[in-house]
């Protein structure tokens, strides 16, 4: 769920992420992993955004994994093979505090080969960095703050200032999910307006997964129903796919069934 939400935010607010990670508001578009290789590529937590000059590779992780350094060089070489003249920035964002040494790793080394990538540990990042743009608001509560509840109130106030209803509801629902990594649901619900979140497509996914928790087949059916509802609302197949975690092919079949 956390992977899907972070991916949704990055692909919905690419300019906010470009400003944060690249230092300037570059216009970025989604780069499909299928463009990089004929071989299967693990894309569940992979985010690729591109401009004419640069490719931004993002991965959000709740837990450290030993294979991250290898994955970084693997994706770097795939992009080089496809776009040899483009620069590439690779950033791994860890969401939860941990004492594991793995979150300090920024290099893949093999004999005479050395590849570097960037790591951001959210709990070490200044909170104000995430309060200036809608797409970054959901991460503020995970940043370096001594008062997470107070920070969530700041985020809720900023969300209330978003004029577009759909953007407001999606940012609120994304904040609800990510805040759940470090705060109790009751505390979050006291601050974030449930009526705003209920209008969000991401909130629909939360409810579907919650109702089907512990039942794999039920979860799949619930997500398919959410996907059908979103398709009927006219949402694009690619957006439905990344929100629900269903594959493009699965959503295409549902779209055909929906007529």
Give the location of each predicted region.
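Elongated, amphipathic alpha-helical interaction scaffolds
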Residues: 1-259
């Amino acid at each position: 769920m956390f992977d899907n939400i972070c991916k949704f935010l990055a692909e919905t607010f690419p300019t906010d992420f470009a400003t944060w990670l690249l230092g300037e508001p570059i216009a970025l578009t989604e780069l499909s992993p299928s463009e990089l290789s004929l071989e299967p590529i693990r894309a569940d937590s992979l985010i690729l955004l591109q401009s004419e000059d640069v490719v931004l590779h993002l991965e959000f992780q709740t837990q450290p994994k030993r294979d991250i350094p290898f994955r970084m060089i693997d994706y770097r070489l795939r992009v080089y093979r496809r776009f040899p003249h483009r620069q590439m920035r690779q950033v791994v964002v860890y969401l939860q505090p941990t004492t594991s040494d793995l979150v300090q790793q920024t290099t893949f080394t093999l004999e005479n080969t050395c590849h570097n990538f960037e790591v951001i540990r959210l709990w070490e990042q200044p909170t104000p960095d995430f309060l200036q743009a809608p797409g970054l608001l959901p991460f503020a509560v995970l940043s370096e703050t001594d008062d997470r509840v107070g920070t969530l109130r700041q985020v809720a106030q900023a969300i209330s200032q978003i004029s577009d209803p759909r953007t407001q509801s999606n940012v609120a629902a994304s904040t609800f999910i990510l805040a759940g990594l470090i705060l109790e649901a009751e505390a979050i619900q006291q601050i974030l307006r449930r009526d705003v979140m209920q209008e969000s497509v991401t909130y629909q996914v939360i409810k579907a997964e919650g109702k089907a928790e512990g039942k794999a087949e039920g979860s799949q059916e619930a997500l398919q129903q959410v996907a059908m509802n979103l398709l009927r609302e006219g949402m694009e197949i690619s957006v439905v796919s990344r929100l629900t975690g269903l594959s493009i092919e699965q959503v295409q079949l549902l779209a055909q069934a929906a007529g």
